[in-house]
Amino acid sequence: MGVNADGRARYRSVYAQTREEVIAKRQAAEAEILAAKTRKRPTEFNLLIIGAGTHGRDVYEIARSLHVFRKISFLDDSVQGENIIGRCSDLLKYRSQYPCAFVAIGDNKLRRRYAELLREYNFLIPSIVSPAANVSGMAQIGDGVAILPLARVGDAELGDFTIVASNGVVNSSAVLGKCCHVDCGAIVKKEARVKDGTWVKSGEILG
């Protein structure tokens, strides 16, 4: 960093700041970055995931990578492990601590059952979309939708609580109903109409 006789730092062709001013601004910027990393997020960004199985863990990793949620915990009836704070029947008990909730259960009927409870209890219901998925900016994505890494979604419509698994493909102009599941490697063709609760199995081509 060059300076002139007055001690002003050279920025391109202009001597605009003293060395001390440059250092002070740099230190202030570094302090702000550190503060942003450690700043507590409000309680409304706590997320409760219903289901701690394989799909639940996938959703957890995506949600964590988004750096949106302050705290992420699970409810599960059969799995014991880290971050599991209670059973699925405890859902209402945690409403005040975890305003956001997501149903991460692969079974379409069971997922729909808990989805109805989230509505009844007035949870905020985010969609969880992996940054590693290829999703059109024109896609219409409902509440509680999970789109996993390497999935591809065109200019399509995904109903509430639908899952598009890794390497699943939903082509443009397709319309999926609520609580559908496009499994790994499954393809929903262009302009297909998919009924609520449909499971498109791995390797299947629908439409």
Which residues fall in each region the model found?
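Short alpha-helical
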Residues: 21, 54-57, 109-110, 140, ...
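Left-handed beta-helix
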Residues: 131, 136-137, 142-143, 147-149, ...
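Phosphate-bearing ligand-interacting subdomains
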Residues: 79-134
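A general structural motif
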Residues: 44, 69-71, 98, 122, ...
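Short, solvent-exposed amphipathic alpha-helical segments in soluble enzyme
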Residues: 30, 63-67, 118-120
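Short, surface-exposed polybasic/aromatic micro-patch for ligand or macromolecular engagement
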Residues: 1-39
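Hydrophobic, well-ordered beta-alpha structural blocks that scaffold small-molecule cofactor pockets
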Residues: 41-83, 87, 92-94
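Short amphipathic alpha-helical segments
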Residues: 60-62, 113-117, 159
